[in-house]
Regions:
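Internal helix-loop-helix
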Residues: 1-39, 43-44, 86-87, 93
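Short acidic, glycine/serine/threonine-rich loops at helix termini
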Residues: 28, 59-64, 87-91, 108, ...
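Internal maturation/activation junctions in enzymes
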Residues: 31-66, 70, 233, 237-250
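Short Pro/Gly-enriched beta-strand edge/turn motifs at strand-loop
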Residues: 46-52, 76, 125-130
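Short Gly/Pro-enriched turn/cap motifs at secondary-structure boundaries
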Residues: 56-59, 84-86, 104, 134-141
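A short core secondary-structure module
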Residues: 76, 80-125
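A glycine-rich, basic-preceded beta-loop-alpha segment at the flavin cofactor/substrate interface
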Residues: 120-125, 129, 134, 141-172, ...
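Extended amphipathic alpha-helical segments enriched in small hydrophobics
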Residues: 173-242
């Protein structure tokens, strides 16, 4: 996945792939009973998403107001207002944070759920209030999603939900770093091609010492950033199998 992001060098398309593959991660590790969804998102049969941010909290997940209630064989989510939901309208399934009834306040009271687009009766399982107007990553539809009685499936243990959530977000943070370095490499490639063709003061830009210096400086920065990003991916690859409470390898 990370090699793909580097070679793709497109933040919008890679975001869609990342939020899709993120769905597979906690299913594989903590919810083997939902393996059919893992196979669908990994083999291109379904798009995934991660919807956690709410309007009152932003990145403060502990402020989430979405309530999860066990009703018979399924959980239902109420009062959900996921305010910046990437993949809204596109995703077939999403990872969603919610607080089970009776759970403590704050981030440690959150559980992680799998939310299909359609419920068991084939009806739409959530409502997209509107899509955002964005200046960047416009290839990714981002919107506001309302959850009211939405069917969902619990990932792992409810009391460990915040840990699963942060693990899943780590995948996207690593993807962001790799994608940034891929985009930087693409920009350098295009720049080198341009300075070989463009002339000023009677010679090609590539022959000007200051231009050559700038390109060298940028190349070193890109190579260093890529090395750091790959080192982070390698560290995560060594420790991802750790479970809460994590050992020293994970920390």
């Amino acid at each position: 996945h990370f090699a793909l992001g580097y070679l793709l060098a497109d933040g919008g398309l890679y975001c869609i792939l990342t939020i899709t593959h993120q769905v597979a991660y906690p299913i594989h590790k903590y919810a083997p009973g939902l393996a059919s969804w893992k196979e669908r998102v990994l083999y291109g049969e379904a798009f995934g998403a991660t919807w956690m941010t709410e309007i009152q909290g932003g990145s403060d997940l502990g402020a989430n107001r979405t309530v999860a209630r066990r009703e018979g064989e399924v959980w239902r989510l109420y009062g959900g207002d996921k305010y910046f939901a990437s993949g809204a309208g596109l995703a077939d399934v999403a990872l969603v944070t919610a607080r089970p009834e009776g759970a403590p306040p704050g981030p440690k009271g959150l559980a992680l759920f799998l939310l299909p687009r359609l419920d068991r009766e084939g009806r739409l399982n959530y409502r997209v209030r509107r899509l955002k107007r964005k200046s960047g990553t416009r290839a990714v539809p981002s919107g506001e999603v309302e959850l009211e009685g939405s069917e969902a499936y619990l990932i792992g243990r409810a009391e460990e939900g915040i840990y699963y959530t942060l693990e899943t977000l780590t995948v996207s943070r690593l993807a962001n770093a790799i994608a940034a370095m891929g985009i930087a490499a693409k920009a350098l490639l295009e720049t080198r091609e341009r300075v070989r063709r463009r002339q000023s003061f009677g010679r090609f830009l590539a022959d000007h010492p200051l231009v050559r210096y700038d390109l060298l400086d940028l190349s070193v920065r890109q190579a260093g950033g890529l090395a750091l990003a790959l080192a982070a991916v390698e560290a995560f690859d060594r420790a991802w199998h750790e479970r809460p409470p994590y050992g020293e390898a994970y920390h």
